[in-house]
Curated annotation (Swiss-Prot):
GO terms for molecular function: structural constituent of ribosome. InterPro entries: Ribosomal_eL21, Ribosomal_eL21_arc, Ribosomal_eL21_sf, Translation_prot_SH3-like_sf. GO terms for cellular component: ribonucleoprotein complex; ribosome. PANTHER family: 60S RIBOSOMAL PROTEIN L21. The lineage of its organism: Archaea, Thermoproteota, Thermoprotei, Thermoproteales, Thermoproteaceae. The gene is rpl21e. Pfam families: Ribosomal_L21e (PF01157). Residues 1-21 are annotated as: Disordered. This is Large ribosomal subunit protein eL21. Keywords: Ribonucleoprotein, Ribosomal protein. One of its GO terms (biological process) is translation. The keyword Acyltransferase does not apply. Belongs to the eukaryotic ribosomal protein eL21 family.
Length: 100
């Protein structure tokens, strides 16, 4: 028997899928939105952009913008009780609408 591979996008068939009305590229407002350090953001993976997408375990996580790296943002988030630092491009981020 051959061992089954577990790639980077393993078990993401339903998670990284767009609804029929969302197909194609996202609007420019999502790409051009400027985040400042201290802003809270939601990591929302856009399956259109595969190369620079964060891992699926961070889908839906809320983080805080620490700074920028090129055109990407450095995000601090928690995975369980561990602090994680992610470098995420704007197409995979949206502003957090929650209270505090």
């Amino acid at each position: 028997m051959v061992k089954r591979t577990h790639g980077y996008r393993y078990k993401s068939r339903k998670l990284l899928r767009k609804k029929p009305r969302e197909r194609g590229l996202s609007g420019l407002s999502r790409l051009l939105y400027e985040y400042k350090p201290g802003d809270r953001v939601v990591i929302d993976i856009d399956p259109t952009f595969v190369e620079n997408a964060p891992h699926r375990r961070y889908q839906g996580k809320v983080g805080v913008v620490i700074g920028t790296r090129g055109r990407a943002y450095v995000i601090e988030t928690y995975l369980g009780d561990k602090k994680k630092i992610l470098v995420v491009t704007p197409e995979h981020l949206k502003p957090h609408q929650g209270g505090s």
